[in-house]
A protein has these predicted regions:
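A cross-kingdom feature that marks ATP-driven nucleic-acid transaction machinery
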Residues: 1-89
Length: 89
């Protein structure tokens, strides 16, 4: 999963640079080890992503993150949805 996540993040940042999308990038992790793998902030807003190579694994949205940031959606990116994530403007 770590290699998959690193590749997706690198490709997403490249896509944004090529398409002149100004964005800032973060990750979020709590002391209880809940995490959001990737957070992208741009003029359209903020979105969180969790990366799972196995598309059969269900998305577990971190409850702590949702409590503190209810307006930020968290999406799952897997082998079936990665292309739309990489090319999203």
């Amino acid at each position: 999963d770590a290699l998959w996540m690193n590749w997706l993040i690198a490709e997403r940042i490249k896509w944004n640079k090529i398409n002149n999308v100004m964005a800032e990038y973060f990750f979020w992790r709590s002391h209880t080890r809940q995490q959001v793998d990737f957070i992208e902030c741009n003029v359209k807003g903020m979105e969180g992503y969790k990366f799972k190579y196995n598309k059969k694994k269900p998305l577990k949205k971190p409850p702590l993150f949702q409590n503190h940031y209810p307006d930020i959606p968290v999406h799952t990116v897997n082998t079936g949805t990665y292309f739309s994530f990489l090319t999203k403007k």
